[in-house]
A protein has these predicted regions:
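Short, small-residue-biased leader/transition segments that mark boundaries at the very start
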Residues: 1-5
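Left-handed beta-helix
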Residues: 8-171
Length: 171
């Protein structure tokens, strides 16, 4: 089964629920930022922010100005692109294996994209297995998920959240 983003919108927003609520009760200070900044207050904001990193100017701002990103060390091999795979305008993390077509997408670490798959305008979170002949477009696939072969998920008008808990594969 899958969950649509509208089901997840009932979360707290820092600006709406904290800053605006307490602006007359507390002393709140801020300053104008000229550089890149996004308030991630919804699933759509999360999606848009990740997609922004596919733009060269945003990517260069972060990775050239701040080249050292400290994170959990996994000691993973670089991504592997098997014969027949095609990747265009995408970010693919370490430990991934790509067998299909990935376009305008962000693929997090340790994800597997099967043969004859098409992934477009999507975010595939870490440790996801996507079976052969699968089409995913305008979606966010949840971490540690397994998408069965021959699946079809397309977000129409809004980002679709794909959550499938199937049998696990180890990469």
């Amino acid at each position: 089964s899958d969950v649509c983003s509208s089901d997840l919108e009932d979360r707290y927003d820092f600006v709406r629920d904290i800053l605006i609520r307490y602006k007359d009760l507390k002393r709140i200070y801020g300053y104008k930022i000229k550089d890149y900044w996004r308030n991630i207050a919804s699933v759509d904001d999360y999606y848009s922010t990740n997609m922004d990193f596919l733009k060269a100017d945003v990517r260069n701002y972060f990775f050239k100005q701040y080249p050292d990103v400290y994170s959990k060390v996994d000691d993973l091999p670089p991504a592997k692109y098997n014969p027949g795979s095609q990747v265009r305008n995408s970010l693919v993390s370490s430990g991934c294996i790509i067998n299909g077509v990935v376009e305008n997408s962000v693929i997090f670490k340790k994800s597997y994209i099967g043969n004859n798959c098409v992934i477009k305008n999507s975010i595939i979170l870490n440790d996801v297995y996507i079976g052969d002949n699968t089409h995913i477009e305008n979606c966010i696939v949840e971490s540690r998920d397994t998408i069965r072969a021959n699946s079809y998920f397309v977000g129409e008008g809004e980002v679709k959240i794909v959550v499938e808990r199937n049998e696990r594969y180890v990469i």
